[in-house]
Every structure is written in structure tokens, then in C-alpha cells.
């Protein structure tokens, strides 16, 4: 479930792609990565990406945030979400 090693979306200062750069996502406010065009729903959500919030979001992004541009259907298995969140937590200074 994790992003491949060396993925630009995970690198500090990496480029935005289909989604925003994920470096430092845990603890960051939704819709705030410079240079990425977010949906209005994401920009206006006020969501803070904590591990708990990411768990709910990653299960079903469109249910969690109606109007999101996220095309990913979600991770139904709790362990897959936990593994991905643990990985995302390593992407920080």
C-alpha cells in the first residue's frame, strides 16, 4: 500500500503530480501544499491530517470528503491503512 521508494510525491521538496507532495502530510492542514490545485471541498475542509483522520479518509476518500478530486477508491483493510499511515509518518524532518 505504500508509495514506491524514491517516489517524488514522498520526497522532501518533491514535485506535485496527480496529487500533492506528501512529505510532512501528518500534522498538516488539508489543501495547503503550494503549487497543487485542490478541489474546493479540500480547500474549505479545515481538516488536519492526524493519523486518526487519515485512517478514516484512506478507507473511503469520497465518503469522508464529498467533492474531493481524489480518484483513489480507498483501502478497506485496516492493516493496509495502518501500514501506509506509519510510512507517511516517516516523511518529515
From Swiss-Prot:
Gene3D superfamilies named in the record: Cytochrome c-like domain
Keywords: Electron transport, Heme, Iron, Metal-binding, Mitochondrion, Respiratory chain, Transport
Ranges where the record places region Disordered: 1-21
Domain of life: Eukaryota
Claim: Heme is one of the keywords in the record: yes
Any one GO MF annotation of this record: metal ion binding
Residues binding heme c: 70
Start-end of Low complexity biased regions: 1-13
Record has Chloroplast as a keyword: no
GO terms for cellular component: mitochondrial intermembrane space
Subcellular location: Mitochondrion intermembrane space
Record PTM: Binds 1 heme c group covalently per subunit.
Role of this protein: Electron carrier protein. The oxidized form of the cytochrome c heme group can accept an electron from the heme group of the cytochrome c1 subunit of cytochrome reductase. Cytochrome c then transfers this electron to the cytochrome oxidase complex, the final protein carrier in the mitochondrial electron-transport chain.
PANTHER family documented for this protein: CYTOCHROME C
Annotated family: Belongs to the cytochrome c family.
Protein known as: Cytochrome c
Protein species of origin: Trypanosoma brucei brucei
